[in-house]
């Protein structure tokens, strides 16, 4: 048993045929307590404690939604058309749901309410004017658990999904609010990624930036300054490797396996990564391969099968 009598269920259960009614799904797979609501309660309490003690605070709020399994309070689900879902999701990779498209949209709606609750709470405590709020996501949209990314147009023409080092797996929204520092409506084309947040937060907190890292301080970007990218962007995930250097992107996949691929894309001209220029631009390819080689350290804990293992 879990919090407030929530019984456990198999996380990846698959049913052979649709259940007779929506209520049967809810009775079998929905519980009394919705975990994102508990996350929110704890987050607001954390802010209250810091405010009561008149201390600065850093709140990292990793909402578990939207994410599979598709689960959301029924009142959020009912805001979306039943016509969206002619076929239920029977489960397998995650739990079944009678209205998977509506459930995914409703989870995003619930997240929107969470963000609004945090912003309203900061406002009620008089903290909004002196608080930097940043919103982002950890990866692109998924294919699993009944999520219909094609229905929602989630990738907007980009290649790849969650788990891929193609742009559809890497590009995520990033929104920042900082009254008096960030002009509302500002849009930046500066290429950035999560390693940039460490030096950015050090700068915001007025702390020295003395440790080696891969990031670049984004405060000048927040303030509307034109900034050049000083450090290349580098990723590894599973048997994949990617590097962005200027307008160019190197993508290596299936490393350590049969038929590995090495591709080169010009992201400005080809954000959908459809035109492999590795053969046409051998000098650019060689340069990015050398940069990627020097951008990494072998890992004994999480070895890359194609780069670390013999």
What is each stretch, according to the model?
Residues 1-195, 204-213, 252-259, 268-274, ...:
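Active-site-proximal cap/lid insertion segments
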Residues 223-228:
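Basic phosphate/pyrophosphate-binding loop/patch that engages nucleotide-derived ligands
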Residues 264-265:
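Short hydrophobic beta-strand that contains or immediately precedes a catalytic carboxylate
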Residues 231-234:
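WW-domain-binding short linear motifs
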Residues 199:
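Glycine-rich, aromatic-lined ligand/substrate-binding cores of catalytic
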